[in-house]
Curated annotation (Swiss-Prot):
InterPro entries: EFG_II, EFG_III, EFG_III/V, EFG_IV, EFG_V-like, EFTu-like_2, G_TR_CS, P-loop_NTPase. This is Elongation factor G, mitochondrial. The gene is MEF1. GO terms for molecular function: GTP binding; GTPase activity; translation elongation factor activity. It comes from Candida glabrata (strain ATCC 2001 / BCRC 20586 / JCM 3761 / NBRC 0622 / NRRL Y-65 / CBS 138) (Yeast). Belongs to the TRAFAC class translation factor GTPase superfamily. Classic translation factor GTPase family. EF-G/EF-2 subfamily.
C-alpha cells in the first residue's frame, strides 16, 4: 500500500528547507501509479534497447559511450551559429572566434557560403566534429548547425533524422517563437531529446524564466532551470549551478577560463527556490526521484544528474541552461550538459525495414561486428564532385570497400572517406557505428540506404513538406547548359526545391518553401554557375477539391478502322473526410466485370488527373474516387482506353461536385519594437489576417496571425516601411482553406484566358 503524507513534507538539507507543495503531493501520489499505468513511448523502446545492448562487445560500448551526435536548432536570429562558433573555439577546433555576417571579413566558421556570410543566416546544415574533455574522459561530438529560417526547414529535417540529441537555442528576450515551435515539432517527429540553452542573457529585456514558462506552456514540454544567472543584461557575470550550488564565472579574453566560488548572498534565496522547482519538476517525470520524495530524503547531486539524464533521454523533460554566446558566458556548461544528459548512439532505438522479408521491421545494432547499414541524408556538389553525407547505424564503413544502394541495387566503391569540418575535410580510413562521415563519387538521392550487400534493409526517409511558392525562371543568355546543370543539382540536393516545365507558357517553373528559398537558388545560380536569370512574379501553389459527392457512368468509345478503344466505368467521387491532404482510389468491382490490369490503368488515370485539376490546372486535394462497376469489349478494351475513361469521368464528376479552389493559409509571426505595434496590426488587418496571439515583451512584441499566402508577397518591404526596418517576420505553412468565391472566379477566368492563348 502506498502512503502519501497529507501535510507538506519539509526536509532539512545543505541547501536549506525543501518543502513539497500540496499540488506536488497530489501529483506524486498520482504520478507514482500514473507512470506505471501509462508508460511513455520511450519506456517501451528502452526494453528493446536493453536487449540490443546485450549484443554489444565491451569495445562497442566504450566507443558508443564517448560519442554524441548533436544538432543545434533554433528560431532565426536566436544566436545558434554564434553559439556554435564558441563551441568550436572551446573544443579547440578553431583557434580564433569569428562573428556572423562576416563583420571581420571572415564570417562564422559554420557559415561557409558567401551568401550566408553576407545575409548573416545559415542556409545549409554545416557538419563538423570536435572533442570535449570532461571528468578525465574525452568525448567525441558530431555537431550539425542548422538553419533557423523556415524556408530552409528541410535542412533541419535532414539533421534531426540522423541525430541522437539536440541543443535547442532560445532567445532570452523573444522566448519561444514560431520557428521554435516548428523545430520542437520536428524533434518530436524524430524522437530527438534536447537540452535547452537560453541565449542572449546580456540583452536588454532578457527574461529566462519567462522563456522557461513558454517552454512549458507553448511546447507542452516539462522544463526547469538547472542554472540561474548572476546578473543580467549588461551586468551578466556568470551562472549558479543548481545541482552543486556553486557560482561559475567565465574569465579570460574569450571566456575560456572558468572560475568557481560561493553563491552571491543576494542570489541564495532565488537559487534555493529554483532548485526546489527543478526537484519538483523531476519528481513529476521520473519515478526514482518520486520515490526519493516519498521516502522524505533530499536527493544527492548524482541522483539529480541521473534523474535529469533519464527524463531527458526519455523525452519527458528538458534541462534549461543559460548564458550569452556573444559575451562568452555559459557555453562550456552546455558542453558538459551534452555529455551528462544527451544519449549516446547505443541509448537510441534505430530501426529499418527488411525488404527481403516483406518490409518486416528490424532493430539496428550499433556494433562494428554487424553488417554495414548507413543512410545518405545530405548531398552537396563540392569541388571534387558530389559529396554524400552518411550516418553509419550498424557495422563500419571503410575506405576502398564496396557498398550497395538498397533502392537501386547498384554496387559502388568508397574511394574516399572524410570527416567534415564546415567546408573543409579530413581524410579517414574507417568510421564505426554511430559516426557521421562523407564520401565522394556515390550516385544516389537524399534518403537512400546503403548496406554491405548482405542485407536489404531500408530506413524510412525524411519527411518532405510540400512546396507552397512557385515562380517562372528564364536564363538571360541562350546557352542553357549551365542553367539545366544548376537546376538538376539543386533538385538532387534539396527535395523541397522542385522544377517543372510548363507546356502552356513554355516556361521553366521552380517551386519551394518561400520567397527567400527561391531567391537564394536564383542567386546561387548566378554565383556558382554564372547564369543570370529573369524571374516572374511569385505564384501561389493552389489546390483543387470538391465539397459534395458526385456519381459518374462514363463510356469511352473510339473506332477508326481496325481495333478501337472501349471502356465503361461506373462509380462516384467524394470528398475525403478529415482533410488529411491525400487522395484515395478504391475499386469494389465484383464478378470480374473489369479485369485487374484495367483497374490498374484506372488507378494511373486517377493519379494523372489529380496532378492537374479541371479548374485551374493545380493539384487535386482530398478527393476519393470509387469504381464499383463497368464493362469491357472483348476486342476493343485495353489499358489505354480505361486510363482515358478514368481521366474524362474524373473531370466530369469533379465539375459537378461543387468544386473549390484551396489556398495555402500561413502562420505569420512578426517581431518588432513596441512603438510599431499599431502599425503592424494595421498592416495585418489590411491583409485580412486573423490575429491569434500577441506576446508583449520588455521592449518588443511578437504577434502571430493566420493569413492567406497570396496576400503576403511583398510583405517584407511593407513591414520594413512600417517599422523603420526594425521588424522581422517568418512564414510557416498551416493548412489549405477554400478561397473567397470572387477570388475563385478570378482565378478560373485567368486560367481560361491563358488556355485560349
Amino acid at each position: 500500500m502506498l502512503l502519501v503524507p497529507r501535510v507538506p513534507v519539509v526536509m532539512q538539507g545543505k541547501c536549506g528547507l525543501l518543502k513539497i507543495s500540496r499540488p506536488l503531493q497530489g501529483s506524486l501520489s498520482r504520478g507514482f501509479h500514473f507512470s506505471r499505468a501509462h508508460r511513455s513511448e520511450y519506456d517501451e523502446e528502452k526494453v528493446v534497447i536493453d536487449e540490443i545492448n546485450k549484443k554489444l562487445t565491451p569495445v562497442d560500448i566504450q566507443n558508443q559511450q564517448k560519442l554524441r551526435n548533436i544538432g543545434i536548432s533554433a528560431h532565426i536570429d536566436s544566436g545558434k551559429t554564434t553559439f556554435t562558433e564558441r563551441v568550436l573555439y572551446y573544443t579547440k577546433r578553431i583557434k580564433e572566434i569569428h562573428e556572423v555576417r562576416g563583420r571581420d571579413n571572415v564570417g562564422a566558421t559554420m557559415d561557409f557560403m558567401d551568401l550566408e556570410r553576407e545575409k548573416g543566416i545559415t542556409i545549409q546544415s554545416a557538419a563538423t566534429y570536435c572533442s570535449w574533455d570532461k571528468d578525465k574522459n574525452s568525448y567525441h561530438f558530431n555537431l550539425i548547425d542548422t538553419p533557423g529560417h523556415i524556408d530552409f526547414t528541410i535542412e533541419v529535417e535532414r539533421a534531426l533524422r540522423v541525430l541522437d540529441g539536440a541543443v535547442l537555442v532560445v532567445c532570452a528576450v523573444s522566448g519561444v517563437q514560431s520557428q521554435t515551435v516548428t523545430v520542437d515539432r520536428q524533434m518530436r517527429r524524430y524522437n530527438v531529446p534536447r537540452v535547452t540553452f537560453i541565449n542572449k542573457m546580456d540583452r536588454m529585456g532578457a527574461n529566462p524564466f519567462k522563456a522557461i514558462e513558454q517552454l512549458n506552456s507553448k511546447l507542452k514540454l516539462p522544463a526547469a532551470a538547472v542554472q540561474v544567472p548572476i546578473g543580467a543584461e549588461s551586468e551578466l557575470k556568470g551562472v549558479v549551478d543548481l545541482l552543486d550550488m556553486k557560482a561559475y564565472y567565465n574569465k579570460g579574453d574569450n571566456g575560456e577560463i572558468i572560475e568557481s566560488g560561493p553563491i552571491p548572498e543576494e542570489l541564495k534565496s532565488l537559487a534555493e527556490e529554483k532548485r526546489q522547482v527543478l526537484i519538483e519538476t523531476l519528481a513529476d517525470v521520473d519515478e526514482h526521484m518520486a520515490e526519493i520524495f516519498l521516502e522524505e530524503k533530499e536527493p544527492t547531486i548524482q541522483e539529480m544528474k541521473d534523474a535529469i539524464r533519464r527524463a531527458t533521454i526519455a523525452r519527458k523533460f528538458t534541462p534549461v541552461l543559460m548564458g550569452s554566446a556573444l559575451a562568452n558566458t555559459g557555453v562550456q556548461h552546455v558542453l558538459d550538459a551534452i555529455v551528462d544528459y544527451l544519449p549516446n548512439p547505443s541509448e537510441v532505438l534505430n530501426t529499418g525495414l527488411d525488404i527481403a522479408h516483406e518490409e518486416a521491421k528490424v532493430n539496428l545494432i550499433p556494433s562494428v561486428q554487424q553488417p554495414f547499414v548507413g543512410l545518405a541524408f545530405k548531398l552537396e556538389e563540392g569541388k571534387y564532385g558530389q559529396l554524400t553525407y552518411i550516418r553509419v547505424y550498424q557495422g563500419r564503413l571503410k575506405k576502398g570497400s564496396y557498398i550497395t544502394n538498397v533502392k537501386t541495387g547498384k554496387k559502388v566503391k568508397v574511394s574516399r572517406l572524410v570527416r567534415m569540418h564546415s567546408n573543409e575535410m579530413e581524410d579517414v580510413d574507417e568510421v564505426g557505428s554511430g559516426e557521421i562521415c562523407a564520401t565522394f563519387g556515390i550516385d544516389c538521392s537524399s534518403g537512400d540506404t546503403f548496406s554491405d550487400g548482405t542485407l536489404q534493409y531500408s530506413m524510412s526517409s525524411m519527411f518532405v513538406p510540400d512546396a507552397v511558392v512557385s515562380l517562372s525562371i528564364t536564363p538571360k543568355s541562350k546557352d542553357s547548359t549551365n542553367f539545366s546543370k544548376a537546376l538538376n543539382r539543386f533538385q538532387k540536393e534539396d527535395p523541397t526545391f522542385r522544377v517543372r516545365f510548363d507546356p502552356e507558357s513554355k516556361e521553366t517553373v521552380i517551386s519551394g518553401m518561400g520567397e527567400l528559398h527561391l531567391e537564394i537558388y536564383v542567386e546561387r545560380m548566378k554565383r556558382e554557375y554564372n547564369v543570370e536569370c529573369i524571374t516572374g512574379k511569385p505564384q501561389v501553389s493552389y489546390r483543387e477539391s470538391i465539397t459534395i459527392p458526385s456519381e459518374f457512368d462514363y463510356t469511352h468509345k473510339k473506332q477508326s478502322g481496325g481495333a478501337g478503344q472501349y471502356a465503361r466505368i461506373i462509380g462516384d467521387l467524394s470528398p475525403v473526410e478529415g482533410g488529411n491532404k491525400s487522395n484515395v482510389f478504391e475499386t469494389h468491382v465484383v464478378g470480374g466485370r473489369i479485369p485487374d490490369k484495367y483497374l490498374s490503368a484506372c488507378a494511373k488515370g486517377f493519379d494523372e488527373a489529380c496532378e492537374r485539376g479541371p479548374l485551374i490546372g493545380h493539384k487535386v486535394l482530398n478527393v476519393k474516387m470509387l469504381i464499383n462497376d463497368g464493362a469491357i469489349h472483348s476486342v476493343d478494351s485495353n489499358e489505354l482506353a480505361f486510363k482515358v475513361a478514368t481521366l474524362t469521368a474524373f473531370r466530369d464528376a469533379f465539375l459537378k461536385a461543387q468544386p473549390v479552389i484551396m489556398e495555402p493559409i500561413m502562420i505569420v509571426s512578426v517581431t518588432s519594437p513596441n512603438e510599431f505595434q499599431g502599425n503592424v496590426i494595421g498592416l495585418l488587418n489590411k491583409l485580412q489576417a486573423v490575429i491569434q496571439e500577441t506576446d508583449n515583451g520588455h521592449d518588443e512584441f511578437t504577434l502571430r496571425a493566420e493569413c492567406s499566402l497570396s496576400t503576403m508577397f511583398g510583405f517584407a518591404s511593407s513591414l520594413r516601411a512600417s517599422t523603420q526596418g526594425k521588424g522581422e517576420f517568418s512564414l510557416e505553412f498551416s493548412h489549405y482553406a477554400p478561397t473567397a468565391p470572387h477570388v475563385q472566379k478570378e482565378l478560373i477566368a485567368e486560367f481560361q484566358k491563358k488556355q485560349k492563348k
